[in-house]
Amino acid sequence: MQRLSFETTGIPAPVRAVVNSTGPRPGTTRSCVTVAADEEAARGWLLAQPDPAAADKALLTSLASSLGVEVTVETELRFPVGGGFRVQAVGARVLPGSNAENLPLAAARMRGALTGPTKDQAEDWLVMLQAATAGGRKSEAGTAVALELYAGCLMRFPADVAKAACMKLAMTATWFPTLAEINATCEALASSRRLLAHALEQAA
């Protein structure tokens, strides 16, 4: 398969390294420095997006326009006991007619979009969240052990998702959230992208 050029595909410059990271060529290995640079490029691109939904849309548009790979998220309506409704992502699939040769590259690009924040970034967002919420449970993040746990939770999710979750909770939570609440908020924001990544990995 011929490598697509960035000049013709319109792929955002910050994720060029990640898009090409489909694995080392036979007989070669990728250095830790290269991997770190790839992750930093992906992280920077994610954090430059308006929100996780916008990042997901940009990724899907890029996959379709530059690689000929179309993926769709399957959703269902959920009706909470408290009333109202929400749209829940329940699956994803690669559409028929997608360019099979480019599926590994598409999967690599989506893997890059799962890059988590650095520990320093996660801790900075937690400090912001702590400052925005009232006392009570806020003291849970007061010790080094608690901060480590909270930061570790955020680092399991894409960088933009982790930041968006902290921003959302800062605007809606009265008390500093529990670890379970932060995890649940991140899970909801990351569900579509994780399903897309899984579908592409399976297809590739």
Question: What are these language model-derived features?
Answer:
Residues M1-A204:
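Charged interaction scaffolds used for protein-protein
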